Swiss-Prot record:
Its EC number is 1.5.98.3. The FPO complex is composed of at least 13 different subunits. FpoA, FpoH, FpoJ, FpoK, FpoL, FpoM and FpoN proteins constitute the membrane sector of the complex. HAMAP family: NDH1_NuoH. GO terms for biological process: aerobic respiration; methanogenesis; methanol metabolic process. Keywords: Cell membrane, Electron transport, Membrane, Methanogenesis, Methanol utilization, Oxidoreductase, Transmembrane, Transmembrane helix, Transport. It holds the Pfam family NADHdh. The gene is fpoH. InterPro entries: F420H2_dehydrogenase_H, NADH_UbQ_OxRdtase_su1/FPO, NADH_UbQ_OxRdtase_su1_CS. The keyword rRNA processing does not apply. This is F(420)H(2) dehydrogenase subunit H. It is found in: Cell membrane. GO terms for molecular function: Methanosarcina-phenazine hydrogenase activity; reduced coenzyme F420 dehydrogenase activity. It catalyses: methanophenazine + reduced coenzyme F420-(gamma-L-Glu)(n) = dihydromethanophenazine + oxidized coenzyme F420-(gamma-L-Glu)(n) + H(+).
Length: 348
C-alpha cells in the first residue's frame, strides 16, 4: 500500500534535492550496516557454535568493531616488491566504488507526495534491475585487478575461481530476474516492489526464489561458494597480499555487497516496503512502518545468509560448476516458462 502526504506546493521543486540527501544518508548508513553485519556474523556464529563471541569491549561486544577498525587502519600498509603499484593501490577503491554504485538504484521505501510516488533512493531508473546486475558483475574486474596487481599465484588462482563461479551463476541469476520483470511488466525495481502488494513473488515463483537465492549466494562468494578464498588451499585468495586500510576496503566491500544482496531479495521476492492498508493509513505508522518492515525483511535475509556459513560445508569447485549448469540453469528456464504462462493468465 502507498502512503499519501500532503505538502505545500513550493516544496515540490526541492524533492529531487531532498531525495539526494536521503540517498547520501543511506550510503553512510550502509557503511555502518556493514560494520553491524560483521558484528552480527560474529555473534550469530558464536551462538551456533555455543560460544560467547565478542563480549569484552563495550556492551554486547559492540565496541569490538571500533577496536578492530582502529587496529586495521593503523597497521602498516605493505606492498609486495614485484606488485604492479598502480593496480595494487587503486583496485580496492575500484571494487568499493562498484559496490556503492549499486546502492544508488536500490530503494528502501517509498512515499506518495501529492499523488506522485518518490522512492527513498538516490535515483530512480526505468532499467534499474539491469543497472544493478551490471554493477554487480563489474566487481569481478576489481577482483582481477587486485589479483593481477598483487603478482601472487594464490591471488590469481582465487580470481580465476571467482570468474568461473560468476560466469556460471550470473546466467540463472539474470534469467530469474527477467522472470520477475515479466510478471510485473517493468525493469524498474520500484515498480516491481510496489506491484507485489501483499501477494509476494516468493509465493508466485517459489522455484525462482530458490534459484535466485542460491545464485546470489554464489555471486557474493559466501559459503558454500567461497572457493576463491578457501584458507586451506589459497591462504586468503585474491586478497592475500593486502594489509591495513586497503585490506579493510576489500573486506567491507564484501559485506556491503552482502547487504545489497539482502535488499534485492526483499525487493524482488518479499514484497519490499508494502504493508497492510490499516498501517499505511495511520499518520504515524504510515511514515515509519514501510521502511521499518523492509529493513526487518532485509535483516532476516542477512541472518539466513550468515547462518548458511555454518549449515552447509564448502563445495568443491567442480560441484559448484555442476550445480550452476546442470541444476540451476534448467530450473531458471523452467521458472521463466512458468512466469510467462502465469503472466499471460493473470493478464487475461
Amino acid at each position: 500500500m502507498n502512503i499519501m502526504i500532503e505538502i505545500p506546493e513550493f516544496i515540490i521543486p526541492l524533492i529531487p534535492w531532498i531525495r539526494g540527501v536521503v540517498g547520501l544518508v543511506l550510503v553512510g548508513a550502509i557503511f555502518l550496516g556493514a560494520m553491524g553485519a560483521v558484528w552480527l556474523e560474529r555473534k550469530l556464529s558464536a551462538d551456533i557454535q555455543f560460544r560467547y563471541g565478542p563480549s569484552r569491549v563495550g556492551k554486547f561486544g559492540l565496541l569490538q568493531l571500533v577496536a578492530d577498525a582502529i587496529k586495521l587502519f593503523t597497521k602498516e600498509d605493505m606492498r609486495p616488491r614485484n606488485a604492479d603499484r598502480l593496480l595494487f593501490d587503486n583496485a580496492p577503491i575500484f571494487m568499493m566504488s562498484s559496490v556503492f554504485l549499486m546502492l544508488v538504484a536500490i530503494p528502501v521505501g517509498a512515499v506518495f507526495i501529492n499523488g506522485v510516488e518518490y522512492p527513498l533512493a538516490v535515483t530512480e531508473m526505468d532499467i534499474s534491475v539491469l543497472y544493478i546486475e551490471a554493477m554487480s558483475a563489474i566487481t569481478i574486474f576489481g577482483i582481477f585487478m587486485i589479483a593481477y596487481g598483487s603478482n601472487n599465484k594464490y591471488s590469481l588462482l582465487g580470481a580465476f575461481r571467482n570468474f568461473a563461479r560468476m560466469v556460471g551463476y550470473e546466467v540463472p541469476l539474470g534469467i530469474t530476474v527477467v522472470s520477475v520483470a515479466i510478471m510485473t511488466g517493468s525493469l524498474n525495481i520500484v515498480e516491481i516492489a510496489s506491484a507485489q502488494g501483499l501477494l509476494w513473488n516468493i509465493f508466485l515463483q517459489p522455484i525462482g526464489f530458490i534459484v535466485f537465492f542460491i545464485a546470489l549466494m554464489a555471486d557474493m562468494g559466501r559459503l558454500p561458494f567461497d572457493q576463491n578464498e578457501s584458507e586451506e588451499e589459497l591462504v586468503a585468495g585474491w586478497i592475500t597480499e593486502y594489509t591495513g586500510m586497503r585490506f579493510g576496503l576489500g573486506f567491507f566491500a564484501e559485506y556491503i555487497h552482502m547487504i545489497l544482496g539482502s535488499f534485492l531479495v526483499a525487493l524482488l521476492f518479499l514484497g519490499g516496503w508494502n504493508v497492510p492498508a490499516f498501517v499505511a493509513n495511520n499518520p504515524v505508522l504510515g511514515l515509519i512502518a514501510p521502511t521499518g518492515f523492509f529493513l526487518l525483511k532485509t535483516v532476516l535475509v542477512l541472518m539466513t545468509i550468515i547462518g548458511m556459513r555454518w549449515a552447509v560445508p564448502r563445495f568443491r569447485i567442480d560441484q559448484v560448476v555442476d550445480l550452476s549448469w546442470k541444476r540451476l540453469l534448467p530450473l531458471s528456464l523452467l521458472n521463466l516458462v512458468w512466469a510467462v504462462g502465469l503472466g499471460l493468465y493473470l493478464g487475461a
